[in-house]
A protein has these predicted regions:
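Conserved glycine(s) of the Walker
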Residues: 7
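The conserved Walker
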Residues: 4
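Glycine-rich phosphate-binding loops of NTPases
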Residues: 28-40, 45, 65-118, 128-141
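Conserved NTP-handling cores and scaffolds of large molecular machines
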Residues: 15, 19-23, 111-115, 146-154
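Extended, Lys/Glu-rich alpha-helical coiled-coil stalks
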Residues: 123-158
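Conserved P-loop NTP-binding catalytic core
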Residues: 1, 12-68
Length: 158
């Protein structure tokens, strides 16, 4: 725990951003929402053209083997006000073009977006779990995500 404004939620949002990019739940649904989020995530004291980046290092089992990953998501705003973003993934110390190009599939194998909310959540979710009126819904959603039931529900609707 920490004081309000200490950056706990910002840290979690950054972790979601580096791992899931525009699929992260807090960045919005459209490309325009994502670009707005990236623009607003550049430090106020920096020039937009300097851009920003988020990087995370972790160990995970991928393709049956334990390995180390370094994932870096970066972005700048060009003179035409266009947001340019990129991703670089290093696996066991070497840049991997294949893993970078297929990152959405790779991260789904390692740490699926559907279950990330069970492990990466902020104080608001803790408050919801403590609220007897919301706890049942939050718990049900978490269990459905863990079991993949929300995916099955969506598939049955399609």
């Amino acid at each position: 725990m920490g004081r309000n404004g200490a950056g706990k939620t910002t840290l979690l949002n950054g972790l979601h951003l580096v791992l899931y990019g525009k699929r992260a739940s807090h960045v919005g649904r459209t490309r325009a929402d994502y670009e707005t989020y990236l623009r607003e995530s550049i430090h106020r004291g920096a020039h937009q053209s300097d851009g920003a980046s988020v990087e995370v290092h972790f160990d995970a089992t991928y393709d049956g083997e334990l390995g180390s990953f370094r994932v870096r998501r970066y972005w700048t705003v060009g003179p035409d006000d266009q947001v340019n973003d990129g991703l670089a993934v290093f696996h066991d110390g070497a840049k991997s073009t294949f893993i970078t190009d297929h990152w959405d599939e790779v991260i789904e194998e390692i740490f699926p977006l559907e279950i990330s909310s069970l492990f990466l959540f902020d104080g608001e979710k803790i408050e919801a779990l403590a609220d007897p009126y919301q706890a049942a819904h939050v718990t049900r959603t978490a269990i459905e995500s863990l079991l993949g039931l929300s995916i099955l529900d969506r598939l049955s609707l399609d």
